[in-house]
Amino acid sequence: MKKGIHPEMKLVTVKCACGAEHKFYTVKENVRIDVCSSCHPFYKGAGAAGMIVDTEGRIEKFKKKYNLE
């Protein structure tokens, strides 16, 4: 990498709207976010486990369409 052309990375504390704080490196001085892993429904258990996937009849429709048994 060339010296002097890349921005300097800084360790900053990011504050979420829920009040949680996370630290990571960025070129910005401060960062504010609305949703983080502490308050997002997917990470709180309402995501993958709480999602309802409608697959009723799709496999049967596919098999019927292509004459598969």
From Swiss-Prot:
Any GO BP: translation
Residues noted as binding Zn(2+) in the record, renumbered to the chain: 16, 18, 36, 39
Cofactor binding note of this UniProt entry: Binds 1 zinc ion per subunit.
Taxonomy, superkingdom: Bacteria
Cofactor(s) demanded: Zn(2+)
Pfam families according to UniProt: Ribosomal_L31 (PF01197)
InterPro entries assigned: Ribosomal_bL28/bL31-like_sf (IPR034704), Ribosomal_bL31 (IPR002150), Ribosomal_bL31_A (IPR027491), Ribosomal_bL31_sf (IPR042105)
GO cellular component: ribonucleoprotein complex; ribosome
Keyword rRNA-binding: yes
Keyword RNA-binding in annotation: yes
Keyword tags: Metal-binding, Ribonucleoprotein, Ribosomal protein, RNA-binding, rRNA-binding, Zinc
GO molecular function, one term: metal ion binding
Family the UniProt entry places it in: Belongs to the bacterial ribosomal protein bL31 family. Type A subfamily.
Assembly information from the UniProt record: Part of the 50S ribosomal subunit.
Task of the protein: Binds the 23S rRNA.
Identification of the protein by name: Large ribosomal subunit protein bL31
